[in-house]
């Protein structure tokens, strides 16, 4: 069973930056690990966006990666975008990322390689905010930092 790896170097408005690693064994869940620094303390939305285009900063990455046309939700919800990874929590300006997700993949139709990882300014309400924006973005606010997810050496 082959192990696949990917990496994302996130940059944005100073001082927010980070490096995120992705690892998947066979068709198992993807382990997402890493660190993002320069954040305000608290929860920040953390999503895979549709395009690997950062020509106009993080805005050109498009919407959340959502090949099945579902509503925004939390990472444990059946009704969610593929790219909905919930929140990362910063303490002392640093978010230690440790997520395991069975919806994203490093191969096939849910493949995130070549797409953009984004950390947002505000907490993701996981689609439970009671308004239209909640069902699209989780009201996570502006994009603080982003980077294209690329294949890494195994």
UniProtKB/Swiss-Prot annotation:
One of its GO terms (biological process) is removal of superoxide radicals. The modification N-acetylalanine is found at residue 2. Disulfide bonds join 58-146. The modification S-glutathionyl cysteine is found at residue 154. It catalyses: 2 superoxide + 2 H(+) = H2O2 + O2. PROSITE patterns: SOD_CU_ZN_1, SOD_CU_ZN_2. InterPro entries: SOD-like_Cu/Zn_dom_sf, SOD_Cu/Zn_/chaperone, SOD_Cu/Zn_BS, SOD_Cu_Zn_dom. A lipid is attached at residue 8 (S-palmitoyl cysteine). SUPFAM superfamilies: Cu,Zn superoxide dismutase-like (SSF49329). It holds the Pfam family Sod_Cu. One of its GO terms (cellular component) is mitochondrion. Its EC number is 1.15.1.1. One of its GO terms (molecular function) is superoxide dismutase activity. Binds 1 copper ion per subunit. Zn(2+) binds at residues 64, 72, 81, 84. Keywords: Acetylation, Antioxidant, Copper, Cytoplasm, Disulfide bond, Glutathionylation, Lipoprotein, Metal-binding, Nucleus, Oxidoreductase, Palmitate, Zinc. It is found in: Cytoplasm; Nucleus. Cu cation binds at residues 47, 49, 64, 120. Gene3D superfamilies: Superoxide dismutase, copper/zinc binding domain. Its cofactor is Cu cation; Zn(2+). Destroys radicals which are normally produced within the cells and which are toxic to biological systems. Homodimer. Belongs to the Cu-Zn superoxide dismutase family. This is Superoxide dismutase [Cu-Zn]. It comes from Gallus gallus. The gene is SOD1.
């Amino acid at each position: 069973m082959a192990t696949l790896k990917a990496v994302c170097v996130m940059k944005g408005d100073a001082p927010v930056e980070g490096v995120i690693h992705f690892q998947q064994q066979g068709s198992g869940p993807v382990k997402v690990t890493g660190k993002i620094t320069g954040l305000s303390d608290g929860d920040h939305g953390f999503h895979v966006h549709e395009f690997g285009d950062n020509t106009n900063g993080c805005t050109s990455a498009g919407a959340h990666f959502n090949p099945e046309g579902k509503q925004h939700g939390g990472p444990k919800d059946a009704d969610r975008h593929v790219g909905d990874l919930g929140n990362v929590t910063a303490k002392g300006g640093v978010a230690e990322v440790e997520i395991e997700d069975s919806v994203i993949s490093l191969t096939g139709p849910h493949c995130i390689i070549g797409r953009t990882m984004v950390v947002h300014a505000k907490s993701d309400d996981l689609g439970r905010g009671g308004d239209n924006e909640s069902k699209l973005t989780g009201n996570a606010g502006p994009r603080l930092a982003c980077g294209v997810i690329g294949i890494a050496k195994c």
